[in-house]
Amino acid sequence: TTMLVDIHGLLCSGTVKDIIGEDGAAAAYIGRIVPAKNGIVYKCEMSCIEKPAGSNTSFDIDLVSSAHSLAEDVVYDSGAGSLELSLIAAGGDWQVGMRKMSAVGLNWANLPADYIYLANGSGANSGGTYTAGKFIIKLYGANF
């Protein structure tokens, strides 16, 4: 499954692990894993094709999942049942041409039917709106 994500106009709070999304959106996910459509996901990758930009926004953006539908500006791993998974931790600012893969040994067992989100990876900003930023996200799954 390939997702093309444009973050222009989305909000980023100043809190690490907060969900990035539309202002006040009750459901800020960028996709949902459906085993009948995506298969059993076993790997993912994220590539930057336009560098994130915006005043007071984080360019360190993580790809995460949760069993819950979460709103923008909510911490994705609130500890509510430990049903969250950090799929890709950027570990720094995204640049055009960068590609990150999910970690080897990541436990995908809790992923079926999860919601996929972008989250603030650093918390080193005060919060703002993105004016640019595009990513290609690929989920690798099988169902046969």
Question: What are the residue ranges of the model-derived segments?
Answer:
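Surface-exposed, low-hydrophobicity beta-strand/loop segments enriched in small/polar/acidic residues
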Residues: 1-144
